Amino acid sequence: MKATEVIEKLKAKFPGQPEYIQAVSQVLGTIEEEYNKHPEFEKANLIERLCVPDRILQFRVSWVDDNGNVQTNLGYRVQHNNAIGPYKGGLRFHKSVNASILKFLAFEQTFKNSLTTLPMGGAKGGSDFDPHGKSDMEVMRFCQAFMNELYRLIGPDEDVPAGDIGVGGREVGYMFGQYKKLTHQFQGILTGKGLEFGGSLIRPEATGYGNVYFLEDMLKTRGESLEGKTVLVSGSGNVAQYTIEKLLQLGAKPVTCSDSNGYIYDPDGIDAEKLAFIMELKNVKRGRIKEYAEKYGVKYVENARPWGEKADIATPCATQDEINEAEAKTLIANGVFAVSEGANMPTEPAAIKVFQDAKILYCPGKASNAGGVATSGLEMSQNSERLSWTREEVDTKLHNIMDEIHANCVKYGTEPDGYINYVKGANVAGFMKVAKAMMAQGIY
């Protein structure tokens, strides 16, 4: 396989889908060497089969707003690959949703799910419906109308959606209720459910906890630990909050937190009491992080990100493309030797190159934030067993999964000079499991 030739063919076949082409390009560039060690893959034209989704489903969603007007949105489900398990991936409700974005996300989800070591294929779906500014009743009516179409395409052994941007516990609950009404069946057809009807303990904490477990494993490769390390954390939502919580439990000192207006720097560290304030501020009061600075008398920098502060470790947990090339150089100059992504794709490609050229520890979110989808998989297991595991059981299983993801990244990402390229390791590890399953199942 020549990655460039495959990409050119896909560009011609799927014009006007830049997000999808970019995602495929990034993965193919890192797996090309390993792929070419297996001539049987090329004979089966495996890479083209893997790059094209099994199916893309598009449907109309009509619903009535509070003024009695009929609204129409587009709904999608991209079922990318089910070689290792039922299709699994979130539903996104956002005005930017289109086929290209969902194809890109489903492609990425296939490898991310493979990395978790759990039997889950890859999918993604959603709608161009925007829940912001809508009443609860409007959101409920839309979710019910959306499920009126989606229910035909999903099932516990076929396709199990979850939440994503614009789809939280409220939306999952509305869709689950409608599925139950339509089918007269109580099944684990969605994850991210409430604890009262089949949800899992640790699910809210999972992405943040898993991020720190992976970070801990990375540090061990250099004889280091989290004890006493100063950590820069961006964001102040779910992932950032539970990243900070687990950092504290393992002896680290998180010193920053941010939102879209700016960041706070607390040289004494964000302790358990201060974290409780952040959780109350963000989850209940919906306030701004500036209020933390006002309460505790620490530095607040408006319209900036925390990457200019001195620290040992950085973990971006806010949003896409939040570390650029210049910020990456600043982080290294200020003593940062490890970066673990809590958010999805928060580091720009040029910044990743800076980290790798400097030989610091860097892991992409595909591996380090896989704890969320891993715990969704554990929710599926509990639903199948008709059991609910304890908090300790789920946390132990999550920790073991993150350890195994790290081991696979090391296996496939270790360079001849001993440096661990976690980007390559994550992509190759995820790819190889899916590729071997596809080969075993024949041409279909």
UniProtKB/Swiss-Prot annotation:
This protein's UniProt keywords: NAD, NADP, Oxidoreductase
Catalytic residue list: K124 (proton donor)
Complex formation: Homohexamer.
Biological source species: Xylanibacter ruminicola (Prevotella ruminicola)
Recorded family membership: Belongs to the Glu/Leu/Phe/Val dehydrogenases family.
GO biological processes: glutamate biosynthetic process
Catalytic class of the enzyme: oxidoreductase
Superkingdom of source: Bacteria
Name used for this protein in its record: NAD(P)-specific glutamate dehydrogenase
Reaction(s) catalysed by this chain's protein: L-glutamate + NAD(+) + H2O = 2-oxoglutarate + NH4(+) + NADH + H(+); L-glutamate + NADP(+) + H2O = 2-oxoglutarate + NH4(+) + NADPH + H(+)
Molecular function GO labels: glutamate dehydrogenase (NAD+) activity; glutamate dehydrogenase (NADP+) activity; glutamate dehydrogenase [NAD(P)+] activity
NCBIfam families on file: PRK09414.1, PRK14031.1
Binding site for substrate: K88, Q109, K112, G163, S376
GO cellular component: cytoplasm; cytosol
A Pfam family the protein falls into: ELFV_dehydrog_N
